[in-house]
């Protein structure tokens, strides 16, 4: 159990640092008007999770420490649902219902599709 906790912790650290770096980069490129960084990390994380889980299912074990490190750890630390909800709420509070709908719909629909695509390609 301790080994699993440490693997998730290390992976979460890596994923969190990557998420922060990409969010800062995207804010610098696109400006602060739309949370592109969070959208990109959530979609990329969904795809990566599907790929990783499929590859471990095909070539290894989805119960392995490496799978835990990469999925629950790195992908879990990389993606961020709480930030997604907070940014969505801010759009509503700032009078941007169109941005809210676009962001929520794109995140959910594309997230599910990309996870499934990653899984199907690499299984």
Where are the model-predicted features located?
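Membrane-interface helix-loop junctions in multi-pass transporters/channels
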Residues: 1-123
